[in-house]
């Protein structure tokens, strides 16, 4: 059996490719079923965020398993395999384990140390368990990866003051507005007419960061206006006007800065809509939706500047030098956790031998117990029989304790193989070749 991961991220694919591979929560169940239908895939879990799609699997054969996962990704995205393959990465065994732990710790994120990825890994684990697509191996790996992410954030300063996708989007707006005014620093958003489209988790974070950067009023649009109203109630000190998405064009015309973060699988704003709006001043779009909420063609409009998640790198790079130093400390913690998992996984090699040894000794125990009880005669009470049976079970457990502990203890593969051979030979757990 092999642990593998196949996927793509902001490091390997631009947003126009990633948006075709975004798997919404409502499609996860169907996707997991499709992956489990491959005969080589034993366990599988999907991580889908705005910056990555990664499929972790336990497979019988690593080559055919990886090919099956790639086939699924190509079919799901509708991208021809030869066009898709250059954007995909594949990690196997130790590298796959290390990659997931680094992802969970925020070490592979666009924003080093960002915290949202940890909750996304938790969700991946929950969805895998709910859909029964994960088993003992991936469940152990996911659980330990989540613990690793928590450990890195609690024992290092990597997560301290870390920006998120949402905060980076707000900083990008500050940077671009400042550059237009001839400044190289981040300016206040107090004078901007701000529109936020979408009322989900990312929009909540957007509003939180907008507030901290000087914004004191904004318009909030959502398809479900009740959800927008509920979100607005969490910001009583901000002036938030909530409206339906059907009023989008009208409110764009009143805005100078528009943030979009909806779950729409198609753009909600394109050049045709923009051309219908009488823009009296320049307009900036910051789109953090994946798939993108804003069509790329809006950039053709002379009064519009549009940015997506790939443009956040400009802001992120301003903060990375300090975080890179802290990341070294975090990587050493991740490596420790990787070794712990691999030692546990290697110890599973001993399970069949341990089970056979326990089974053989249990058979002997029952046979000898039955002989002894038959000699005791009818005067031997049921209570006394239970005491004797408990005694024999205790003896077996005591006998097994030391060899089982030794077989499961951390050791090299070569050492474990030698130990297993010795136990098998001493207890006749395998049939010897009669021809020898």
From Swiss-Prot:
Residues marked Important for activity (site): 99
Chain positions recorded as NADP(+) binding sites: 198-203
Biological or metabolic pathway of the protein: Porphyrin-containing compound metabolism; protoporphyrin-IX biosynthesis; 5-aminolevulinate from L-glutamyl-tRNA(Glu): step 1/2; Porphyrin-containing compound metabolism; chlorophyll biosynthesis
Record-listed substrate binding positions: 49-52, 109, 114-116, 120
SUPFAM superfamilies per the UniProt record, alphabetical: Glutamyl tRNA-reductase catalytic, N-terminal domain, Glutamyl tRNA-reductase dimerization domain, NAD(P)-binding Rossmann-fold domains
Reaction catalyzed: (S)-4-amino-5-oxopentanoate + tRNA(Glu) + NADP(+) = L-glutamyl-tRNA(Glu) + NADPH + H(+)
PROSITE patterns: GLUTR
Domain of life: Bacteria
One biological process term in Gene Ontology: protoporphyrinogen IX biosynthetic process
Keywords: Chlorophyll biosynthesis, NADP, Oxidoreductase, Porphyrin biosynthesis
Gene3D superfamilies: Glutamyl-tRNA reductase, N-terminal domain (3.30.460.30), NAD(P)-binding Rossmann-like Domain (3.40.50.720)
Family in the record: Belongs to the glutamyl-tRNA reductase family.
Domains as described in the record: Possesses an unusual extended V-shaped dimeric structure with each monomer consisting of three distinct domains arranged along a curved 'spinal' alpha-helix. The N-terminal catalytic domain specifically recognizes the glutamate moiety of the substrate. The second domain is the NADPH-binding domain, and the third C-terminal domain is responsible for dimerization.
Annotated function: Catalyzes the NADPH-dependent reduction of glutamyl-tRNA(Glu) to glutamate 1-semialdehyde (GSA).
Protein name: Glutamyl-tRNA reductase
Gene name in the database record: hemA
């Amino acid at each position: 059996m092999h642990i593998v991961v196949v996927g793509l991220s902001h490091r390997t694919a631009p947003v126009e490719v990633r948006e075709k591979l975004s798997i919404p929560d409502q499609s996860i169940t169907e996707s997991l079923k499709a992956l489990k239908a491959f005969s080589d895939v034993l366990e599988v879990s999907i991580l889908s965020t705005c910056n990555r799609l990664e499929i972790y699997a336990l497979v019988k054969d690593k080559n055919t398993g990886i090919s099956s996962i790639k086939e699924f990704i190509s079919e799901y995205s509708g991208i021809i395999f030869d066009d898709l393959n250059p954007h995909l990465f594949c990690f196997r065994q130790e590298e796959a384990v290390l990659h997931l732990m680094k992802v969970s710790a925020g070490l592979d994120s666009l924003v080093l140390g960002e915290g949202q990825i940890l909750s996304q890994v938790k969700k991946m684990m929950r969805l895998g368990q709910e859909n029964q697509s994960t088993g003992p191996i991936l469940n152990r790996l996911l659980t330990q990866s989540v613990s690793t992410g928590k450990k890195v954030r609690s024992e290092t300063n990597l997560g301290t003051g870390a920006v998120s996708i949402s905060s980076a989007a707000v900083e990008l707006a500050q940077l671009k507005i400042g550059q237009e005014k001839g400044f190289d620093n981040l300016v206040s958003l107090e004078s901007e007419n701000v529109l936020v489209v979408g009322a989900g988790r990312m929009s909540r974070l957007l509003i939180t960061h907008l507030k901290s950067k000087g914004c004191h009023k904004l318009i909030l649009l959502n398809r479900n206006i009740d959800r927008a109203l509920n979100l607005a109630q969490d910001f009583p000190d901000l002036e938030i006007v909530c409206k339906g998405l059907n009023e989008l064009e009208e409110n764009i015309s009143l805005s100078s800065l528009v943030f979009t973060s909806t779950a729409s699988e198609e753009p909600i704003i394109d050049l045709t809509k923009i051309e219908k709006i009488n823009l009296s001043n320049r307009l900036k779009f910051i789109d953090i939706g994946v798939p993108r909420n804003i069509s790329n063609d809006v950039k053709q409009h002379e009064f519009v500047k549009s940015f997506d998640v790939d443009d956040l790198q400009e802001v992120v790079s301003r903060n990375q030098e300090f975080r890179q130093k802290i990341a070294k400390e975090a990587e050493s913690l991740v490596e420790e956790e990787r070794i712990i998992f691999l030692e546990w996984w290697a110890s599973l090699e001993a399970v069949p031998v341990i089970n056979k040894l326990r089974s053989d000794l249990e058979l002997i125990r029952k046979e000898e117990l039955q002989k002894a009880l038959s000699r005791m005669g009818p005067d031997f009470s049921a209570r006394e029989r239970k005491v004797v049976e408990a005694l024999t079970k205790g003896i077996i457990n005591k006998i097994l304790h030391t060899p089982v502990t030794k077989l499961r203890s951390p050791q090299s593969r070569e050492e474990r193989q030698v130990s297993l051979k010795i136990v098998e030979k001493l207890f006749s757990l395998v049939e010897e070749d009669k021809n020898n």
